[in-house]
Every structure is written in C-alpha cells, then in structure tokens.
Amino acid sequence: MSINPILDASSAIKVHTLAASFALTLGPFIFTPKARGKLHKFLGYIWILAMATTAISSFFIYGFKLIWVFSPIHFLSIFILFGLCRAFWYIRNGNVIGHARTMLGMYWYGVLAAGIFTLLPGRMLNRALFPEAPWLGYLFIACGALLIIRHIRRESAGLVG
C-alpha cells in the first residue's frame, strides 16, 4: 500500500477522498437499528456534512468527461445533494421511514456502489491500495457487487428500511 497516489492528486481529489472515506466509515455507526437519540443525530449531521463535501468536491474533478465537463459522478453528486435535502425534510416533518430509506439509499448507492468503482485498476485508489497487485481491485468490486445485490434482494423482500 502506498499513500503517494493520494498525496500526488489534486486538492479536490484529496478533499473528495477524505470526505468519502469519512462517510463510509461513519455509516455503520449511524445505520445500525439501535443507533437512535442524540448520538445518532450528532453523527448524522457529521455524515451529512461529509456527504455534501464529497458531492460538492466532485464538481472540481474532471477525469472522465461524458457530457462537456460532466461525468457520471457529477450526476450522482446532484442526486446526493437532493437526497440530503429530501432526507432532512423527511425527518423535520416526522417521516422517519422516508428519512431512513433516503439515507440508507445514499449510503448503499452513493457511497458503497460508487466507491467500489474507484478500485478499478488504473484508478488512484487502486494504485494506492494495491500497487503490487492491481487485479485485487476486481476482487473487491466483486465482493462489493455481491453485497449490493444481497441488499437489493433484501430490500425488495421488505427486509430492510
């Protein structure tokens, strides 16, 4: 493992990576069924800040242009920013289920699903995490895809959120 690819990246990528890593790490503490009360609320505000920072910083990253300067990550960032507002609106209006589903959706698809693609060989995180064996990125992508498929099946069966 080498931190050099991250240190050599632009400031926007550094901020984006740090904020996304923070959101990824906080998720399990916030989204457990027993996470309620003041700690949940406090960590939730921090998670919202991390997600907003991740989304906003992506608008300064221009690696994969699809339409003009925009890439799929930019469209995901718009989705995340609207999702954060929606989740906040839900909880302010007492819709706990809508809030939980929106927040979990952003975690599963905005953090985990999007995050596994950063492990593709040639990408910065792949070079940082697997400099000697870039193919390991595919292994982590496969494991992440299996987790997401499991989540989708559980969600469609009504077992989550």
Name every feature range the model reports, one short phrase each.
Residues 1-161:
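Alpha-helical membrane insertion/targeting regions
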